[in-house]
A protein has these predicted regions:
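A short, hydrophobic C-terminal helix/tail in secreted or cell-surface proteins
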Residues: 223-228
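Extended beta-strand-rich architecture
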Residues: 2-222
Length: 228
């Protein structure tokens, strides 16, 4: 526009006697983005690296899963390959792919985080009048910690990462968002994804977070699939 005005001539443009403007206010999207930036800055300050994985994933990852049954996958009608034939239900496998990619290149001490949408299909909610009634999209944050917490330091002995370290990161996120852990309920979680795990819920029963040690069957599955 500036180049056009230069050619046309600023003096040839009539300026009205009144100027019109509209006031804008911050909406829900702006507030959500602000919170995301706040959490991202905190995690980066703790040594995390942000990752961004494809929302398309391999449906085979969900075979036999109880937490995320394959029947609830949003399947693609014409997938390019079996590696990208469904929409992800969880951020878990994308993070494991990133870990496997780095571990295969001798980089095993990792701390990752990712913000992303997950997708869910419920056949019971199908409605001929509402084509999208059976589909749900939710925004999630995933954290992955693996390898050594401290390595090759002259001031500190090598120390392996642990679930307690991850628990501290999760609690610090809640504190940064103004949530008092005393008002939340932390309890044991039985889940086929984790060998041992905890969940964080409100007193009303709404689950806010789950974290734990991923079972060997899923970590081995990811490594095997990556090699092939």
């Amino acid at each position: 526009v500036e180049d056009i005005l230069r050619i046309y001539g600023y003096n040839n443009v009539e300026i009205p006697t009144t100027l019109k403007s509209s006031l804008t206010t911050k909406g829900e999207v702006d507030y959500s983005q602000k919170l995301q930036n706040l959490i991202s800055e905190q995690l980066v300050g703790c040594g995390f690296n942000e990752i961004l994985n494809n929302s398309l994933t391999r449906a085979g990852y969900y075979d036999g899963m109880e937490t995320y049954p394959s029947k609830n996958l949003v399947m693609l009608l014409n997938p390019l390959s079996t590696d990208l034939n469904a929409m992800r239900q969880t951020l878990l496998f994308g993070g494991l792919e990133s870990i496997s990619h780095n571990a295969n290149r001798k980089n095993a001490d990792l701390k990752f985080f990712e913000f992303g949408n997950c997708y869910y299909f419920d056949a019971e909610k199908k409605n001929p009048e509402k084509s999208l009634a059976a589909y749900t999209e939710n925004y999630h944050l995933g954290l992955w910690v693996t390898g050594k917490k401290v390595s090759n330091s002259w001031a500190h002995a090598d120390e392996e990462s642990s679930v307690y370290e991850l628990k501290a990161y999760v609690e610090n996120i809640f504190l940064r968002l103004g949530l008092n852990m005393r008002n939340l309920v932390v309890g044991n979680l039985v889940d086929d994804i984790y060998a041992t795990a905890l969940s964080v819920q409100t007193k009303g029963g709404k689950r806010l977070a789950t974290f734990g040690i991923v079972t060997v069957s899923y970590t081995h599955l990811r490594a095997h699939e990556t090699r092939h």
